[in-house]
Amino acid sequence: MILIFFAYISRRETVSQRQTSTIVYNITLMFSTLRCALKILAQIKKRLQQTSSNHENKKYEEVIKDHVGVKIQNIICLLAFVLVVYYQMRCKKMT
């Protein structure tokens, strides 16, 4: 619904249909990527909780923690992508 509202507002501001569809596609892609990243982090958290009780799996737990660090870096890159898309939208509205 948010995307439909955004597309409606964009059309009212005389943005071409091609630009509107590109913006909506970028936002949809961003949200789907974020949703996948959150699912992966939830699975990793679940695995950490399952293995933390077992003393033999300390090495495995450290590997998963490193994996979580990589996923956090990916989320930071995703947020940077969001800022770039937002900046591009603002620049297009100014011109």
Curated annotation (Swiss-Prot):
Its main location: membrane. One of its GO terms (cellular component) is membrane. One of its GO terms (biological process) is cellular bud site selection. It is found in: Membrane. Keywords: Membrane, Transmembrane, Transmembrane helix. It is a multi-pass membrane protein. The chain crosses the membrane at residues 21-43, 68-87. Disruption phenotype: Diploid deletion displays a weak budding pattern phenotype in a systematic assay. The gene is BUD26. Partially overlaps SNU56. Disruption phenotypes caused by deletion of this gene may also be a result of a defect in its overlapping gene. The keyword Membrane applies. This is Putative uncharacterized protein BUD26. The keyword Acyltransferase does not apply.
